[in-house]
From Swiss-Prot:
Function: Catalyzes the formation of 6,7-dimethyl-8-ribityllumazine by condensation of 5-amino-6-(D-ribitylamino)uracil with 3,4-dihydroxy-2-butanone 4-phosphate. This is the penultimate step in the biosynthesis of riboflavin.
Residues noted as binding 5-amino-6-(D-ribitylamino)uracil in the record, renumbered to the chain: 22, 56-58, 80-82, 113
Biological processes, Gene Ontology terms: riboflavin biosynthetic process
Annotated family: Belongs to the DMRL synthase family.
Keyword Flavoprotein carried by entry: no
InterPro entries: LS, LS/RS, LS/RS_sf
A Pfam entry, by short name: DMRL_synthase
GO molecular function ontology, one term from the record: 6,7-dimethyl-8-ribityllumazine synthase activity
Binding of (2S)-2-hydroxy-3-oxobutyl phosphate, residues: 85-86, 127
Cleavable signal peptide: none
Protein name: 6,7-dimethyl-8-ribityllumazine synthase
Bilayer-spanning residue ranges: none
PANTHER family: 6,7-DIMETHYL-8-RIBITYLLUMAZINE SYNTHASE (PTHR21058:SF0), 6,7-DIMETHYL-8-RIBITYLLUMAZINE SYNTHASE DMRL SYNTHASE LUMAZINE SYNTHASE (PTHR21058)
Lineage: Bacteria, Pseudomonadati, Gemmatimonadota, Gemmatimonadia, Gemmatimonadales
Gene name tied to this protein: ribH
Length: 164
């Protein structure tokens, strides 16, 4: 049996961070955490692009457009959807996550989820550099780890377009 895992190594990588402006008191620290984590693991600052979109709903289309350029090894999506009094939260959170997953699958590129879905602003702040860490940084490290895993165990030329 072979067992593989990756390490968050950033040397030579080009990463796009796509961030939602809505709830910017939370999303700015998430984006900053992602960039800081990437640089801390060796991604050159000039190899990181940050794209700001109006809200979480726009994250998937911006990620898709970025990946279609073939300039990036991975995408890190960060945003914050905070529950309100209407079902809007469920629609935005679920469909945004689905759209990001589909972009990852369609482009065969890691797209990591730094999208907070919380009941309160305080819960979001706790996950954007507060007592629960920075989920933007966590998502950035996950992207690098998956890229390294792919390099070690799953090179792109080892399977055809159908994943076989």
């Amino acid at each position: 049996m072979a067992e593989f895992s990756g390490e968050p190594r950033g040397e030579g990588r080009r990463i796009v961070v796509v961030a939602s402006r809505f709830n910017e008191g939370v999303t700015v620290p998430l984006a900053e955490g992602a960039v800081s984590a990437l640089v801390g693991k060796g991604v050159a600052f000039d190899n990181i692009d940050v794209l700001w979109v109006p809200g979480a709903w726009e994250l998937p289309v911006a990620v898709r457009r970025a990946l279609s350029s073939e300039r990036y090894d991975a995408a890190v999506a960060v945003g914050a959807v905070i529950r309100g009094d209407t079902p809007h939260f469920d629609i935005v959170a679920g469909e945004t996550a689905r759209g990001l997953m589909e972009a990852s699958r369609d482009f065969d590129v890691p797209v990591t989820l730094g999208l907070l879905t919380t009941d309160t602003l305080e819960q979001a702040e706790a996950r954007a550099g507060g007592v629960h860490g920075n989920k933007g940084a966590d998502a950035a490290l996950a992207a690098l780890e998956v890229l390294d895993l792919f390099d070690r165990a799953l090179p792109a030329n080892d399977y055809d377009e159908d994943g076989e």
